[in-house]
């Protein structure tokens, strides 16, 4: 399995990479939505994208809208953000997110979300 981590925080990218690699994922990273789209359009397929909402250059909402419009419909997308507002959650799900995980979170919550996406066994 391959995962793309899109977050402007190096700390968060490293943290998510560790969690994913423990579960056998191969990971790539991007620091903003535009760089994330560039990675996706490079032709290497990903099974999962973990996307923050608040990033420079292109935010997570714009990235979600673009990647779904560009045909990345099979790839699972999990929003990983500090935004806890219901409007943000609904907006992200409407834009094409498959799951939503609020920071901070623990290992169990992360595993549960991956299982809900069918990417790991419960």
Where do the protein language model's features map onto the residues?
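Acidic, metal-coordinating helix/loop segments flanking the phosphotransfer/catalytic sites
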Residues: 29-48
């Amino acid at each position: 399995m391959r995962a793309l981590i899109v977050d402007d925080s190096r700390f968060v990218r490293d943290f998510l990479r560790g969690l994913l690699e423990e579960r056998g994922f191969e990971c790539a990273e991007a620091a903003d939505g535009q760089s994330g789209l560039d990675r996706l359009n490079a032709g290497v397929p990903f099974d999962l994208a973990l996307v923050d909402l608040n990033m420079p250059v292109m935010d997570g909402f714009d990235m979600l809208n673009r990647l779904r419009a560009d045909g990345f419909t099979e790839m699972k997308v999990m929003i990983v953000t500090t935004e806890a507002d219901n409007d943000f959650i609904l907006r992200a799900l409407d834009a094409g997110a498959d799951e939503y995980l609020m920071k901070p979170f623990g290992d169990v919550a992360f595993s549960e979300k991956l299982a809900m996406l069918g990417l790991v066994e419960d």
